[in-house]
Amino acid sequence: MKVYYSLWPLFFMVILPLWMASCYQAPEFPVVPKIDFESVNFKQGATGFDTLIVRVRFQDGDGDLGLGGEENDPPYHSLNFLPSPDGDPCRFSERFDEGCRDVLPPEFNCVDYQYFTTLGQDTIRDTLYVELNPNQNNFMVDIMTKKNGQFEVFNMRELLCVNPLYGRFPPLKDNFSVDGPLEGVIEFKPPSSAYMALFRNDTLKLRIQIKDRALHDSNVIESCEFTLNELLEVGGCPQRP
């Protein structure tokens, strides 16, 4: 199975506690990261791009948190390609050929197919069947909308053919060969011109998860309920009991 790499934009800030730069006794945490919701805010921009500001607290026992934008080798690559019988990626025009037809969906969609002009050093200009690698990002936010009293995930990729609010926060220490606990706050600020157009009148929640370098998934948390106008009026949505 071949892999492909791409870089994702970064809109992160990380706040670490004072004990990390002092003589205080370091705490002990599990090696699987744990997160807690802190707040969500919304800022309207003068240039047409608004910003959703998500803050979570984290703890991790061995401190293997963060991915650099240049870390694109497996297991952090972005895409997998299912090969045709000759070993090359299956192309849309070959989807019914022997060897491809059993793995390719019959209809075009923007989740399973992507158009490429180049692949590595090769010029291809073709549509290829791809599988998204769930390990390419380490901070995942899903927007959920309330319908008939129940929250459901708004699937940006399937409905709009755009990437969801997933990204990478940078490495939180210089040397990952030395284990040590980490805790702090991660702030994710993805900009978009579509927030108000899509969700102006909706009641929303956020579903959030992070992943460490060993591919341990944290617990999944949810934000408080909010509307974008409420965030503008009250200045944010903290966690409520």
Go through each PLM region and give its residues.
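Hydrophobic helical h-region of N-terminal Sec-dependent signal peptides
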Residues: F12-P17
